[in-house]
C-alpha cells in the first residue's frame, strides 16, 4: 500500500515492486559463499599464498523515486549487508515512506541498529556522501546527468561507484510478428509505471508493411487502458510522480507534434 500511495503506481505494479525487493534479498543469501577466499600451495619455492575477502565498511545508496522498494531493499541493501558492510540510504525525495517502512521490517526481523541507516535530504546535502572519508562506495540509480556527476566526484575521492543511469530503449518490429501480442507488449513497456522506469519503451521501429496495422492495434489497447488511482485495483496506469513531470511529458509531446509527429491517441 505504501508504494501505491506515495508513488501512484497501479496496484499490481506496486506489488511487483515489493516482490522484486524480496527476490533481491533471496539472491543475496548466496553471497557469503562467493566471499570465500583462495589459497595456493607452493606458489613459488617455499611460499604459499592465501587471499581473504573482507568488508569495506560503509556504503551510501542514492535512491530514485520510481522503485522505492525494489531498488534500495532489493538491489542495494541485501548484497551490501551479506558482504559484511553497512549502508546509509538517501531516501528518494518524493517517495521516502516505503524505504523507511521496509527498514522498520528489517529491524523487526532482528537486524541490529546501525546496519541500515536512512537520511532524508536534498541532493545538495547528499554531496557529503561523495567526499566523506568513512564512505567507501556509492551505489546510485537515477538520471544520467546526476549519475555522471556522482561517478566522477566519488571516483576522484577514491570511492567505488555503481551508477545505473537512463536508457533509450527501442523495439524493432518485423512483418512476421504476431500483431496482437506485440501491441500488448509495447503497451506494457510504454505505459507500465506511467513510463517512469529505465525499461520504458519510447521508440518502436516498425517494418512499413505492417505499420498501420500495428499502430491501430496499439491505439485500441491504449484506449482500453484504465487510468486511475492506485487504490482502485482495476486501474491499469496511475499518475506520474508530480506536476513538474507532467509538464515535461506534455512538452515532449508538443515538441514532437511541432517537428512533424502525428498524434494518434
Regions found by a protein language model. Name each.
Residues 6, 10-13, 17, 91-94, ...:
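Catalytic cores of large soluble enzymes that bind and process phosphate-bearing ligands
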Amino acid at each position: 500500500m505504501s508504494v501505491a500511495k506515495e508513488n501512484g503506481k497501479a496496484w499490481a505494479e506496486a506489488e511487483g515492486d515489493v516482490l522484486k525487493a524480496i527476490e533481491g534479498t533471496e539472491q543475496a543469501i548466496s553471497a557469503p559463499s562467493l566471499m570465500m577466499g583462495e589459497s595456493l600451495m607452493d606458489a613459488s619455492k617455499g611460499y604459499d599464498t592465501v587471499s581473504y575477502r573482507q568488508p569495506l565498511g560503509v556504503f551510501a545508496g542514492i535512491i530514485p523515486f520510481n522503485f522505492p522498494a525494489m531498488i534500495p531493499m532489493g538491489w542495494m541493501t541485501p548484497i551490501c549487508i551479506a558482504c559484511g558492510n553497512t549502508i546509509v540510504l538517501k531516501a528518494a525525495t518524493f517517495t521516502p515512506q516505503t524505504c523507511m517502512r521496509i527498514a522498520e521490517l528489517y529491524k523487526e526481523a532482528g537486524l541490529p541498529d546501525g546496519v541500515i541507516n536512512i537520511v532524508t535530504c536534498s541532493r545538495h546535502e547528499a554531496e557529503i556522501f561523495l567526499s566523506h572519508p568513512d564512505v567507501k562506495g556509492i551505489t546510485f540509480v537515477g538520471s544520467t546527468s546526476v549519475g555522471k556527476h556522482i561517478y566522477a566526484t566519488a571516483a576522484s575521492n577514491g570511492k567505488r561507484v555503481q551508477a545505473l543511469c537512463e536508457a533509450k530503449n527501442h523495439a524493432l518490429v518485423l512483418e512476421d510478428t504476431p500483431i496482437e501480442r506485440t501491441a500488448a507488449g509495447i503497451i506494457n513497456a510504454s505505459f507500465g509505471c506511467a513510463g517512469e522506469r529505465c525499461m520504458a519503451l519510447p521508440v518502436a521501429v516498425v517494418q512499413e508493411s505492417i505499420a498501420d496495422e500495428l499502430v491501430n492495434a496499439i491505439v485500441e489497447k491504449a484506449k482500453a487502458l484504465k487510468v486511475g488511482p492506485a487504490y482502485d485495483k482495476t486501474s491499469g496506469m496511475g499518475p506520474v510522480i508530480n506536476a513538474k513531470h507532467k509538464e515535461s511529458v506534455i512538452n515532449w509531446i508538443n515538441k514532437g507534434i511541432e517537428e512533424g509527429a502525428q498524434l494518434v491517441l
